[in-house]
Structure formats: C-alpha cells, structure tokens
Amino acid sequence: MAQIGHNISLPERARRIRRHALRMGEVQGQGYIAQALGIADVLAVAYFHATTYRPDDPEWEGRDRFLLSIGHYAIALYAALIEAKIIPEDELETYGADDSRLPMSGMAAYTPGMEITGGSLGHGLGIAVGMSLALKRKGSRSFVYNLFSDGELDEGSTWEAAMSAGSYKLDNLIGIVDVNQMQADGPSLGVLNFEPLGPKFEAFGWYVQRIDGNDIDALVDAFDNARQHRHPQPRIIICDTKMAKGVPFLEARERNHFLRVEPQEWAEAIRIIDAGVTA
C-alpha cells in the first residue's frame, strides 16, 4: 500500500473520509451522501491497507487498479482520494462546479486516481475483467479492485462478467459489492431479489466472503484473505453496509438514496463526525 501516515488509524481514516464527503455535500446542498458515509470504512481499508499506489504518480504502471463502477458514488471516491493526497484537499470546495475536477458523477478524464468513468450501471465489472485479463497477459502482479453496488446486480452484464471472470480464473480480480439495500426505486430486494448472493458467485467459480462492511477489523481480514487466497479464481467481498453510517439522523431517513440536507443539518452532521474517532 502507499506509504502515507502509518501513525493514523484506519477508523480515523474512515472518519476523515466521511468528513470530506460531508464538506463536499455541503457545497452543493445535496448528493449521494448516504452512500459515501456507508462505504467510508471500505474505502479506508482499501486505500490505507490493501492497495498499492503512489499518490504523486496516479498513472504509475505498477499500481493496483481501483475501479468505481457506481458513478454516482464519486463523492465517496473523491473523499478517499483527498485523504490519500492524490487530490488536494482544497479542491473539495469546487465539487460539482463548472470546470471542476470533481464533477458530481465521476469522469476519469477529469479526476486523478479515477480509473474509469462509471455511471451506466452494470459495466464496471466487465471493464475490471478486461483489465485483469490484460494485466495477467502482461505478467503484471497488480490487483484490480471493482467496487459495485447491489443495484448493479439487477443488470445482466454484471452476471456475464462474473461468469467470464470465473472462466478465465482471474485471481488478480477482487470484487467488492456494497449491499446497502437501497436503490433509487426503493429497497433493493423489493426491486429485484438477488439473494442468496454468495452462492451465486460461488457457482461462477469465485472465492466468496460476506462481512459487515462497516467493521474495520472484518474488512482488514477480508482484504488480506482475498489478496492471499492461493486458488486460481476471482475473489469477491460482499459488504453489508448501512446507508449514512455515522450520522444517526441521516441513517433514520427512510428514503436516503439521494439526500437534500438543510444548511444547519450539514453543520450538525459534521459535528457528529468530528466527535468520533480522532486517533
């Protein structure tokens, strides 16, 4: 992993990622902030424990590739890239503005450290399969991570990619599914029931782990297991997360896929996060 501030704990990294995301949300007064709060622990472990990269050289050939399939989660990835010092912190004030490198839906052409342009849901895993196959053929030892959502499990292209990854035995591919149980149209299982999820990926030849995606210790173990797994097969970490994790009054909102938050509520949310882990 990158050599960045090893004296800072992973829970503190997650707290900072949440804070960066809230500050960006405050700039626009709205956004996919619940997803960012929910996935912050995953991103903290990914960027400060698991992946290899150089903050001052985002295009370094030897890096692990971290793909964000879910384009509307861009605010979460920006927060992690800011914490990783790939993007300067002062840029968060430009979030969503004209000519910003931080558009509301991620654009790889604009943003350092963003490997792909996501957004048309269901395509990220297929891109990850192609990258993984190409890296293997080049003899690279880099891993490809693909973060995708439970909503993307509604897309047939996701399952075509899952089958292909198993067929090609892509042991350099690590999928991460954010199962937060909410989509734009309502609760995920009410839109299309994808359970039982683990056995489906196992049937396609994947090594499967399912964990609490807001448990730092469980995430560390899962990422370590995925990287160290010796069988020639792709790996997937199914992360059950809580939307708006860490800010109780936002967690309690029934429909929090896209949040519009009053000015005083942003301040309260940041105050709650600042009262959390500090070391």
From Swiss-Prot:
Bilayer topology term: Multi-pass membrane protein
Keyword Membrane: yes
A GO cellular component annotation in the UniProt record: plasma membrane
Keywords: Cell membrane, Membrane, Plasmid, Thiamine pyrophosphate, Transmembrane, Transmembrane helix
Source taxon at top rank: Bacteria
Alphabetical list of CDD domains matching this protein: TPP_TK (cd02012)
Spans through the membrane: 31-51, 67-87, 115-135
Transmembrane helix is among the record's keywords: yes
Subcellular location: Cell membrane
Cofactor(s) needed by this chain: thiamine diphosphate
Record-stated family: Belongs to the transketolase family.
Stated name of the protein: Putative uncharacterized transketolase family protein y4mO
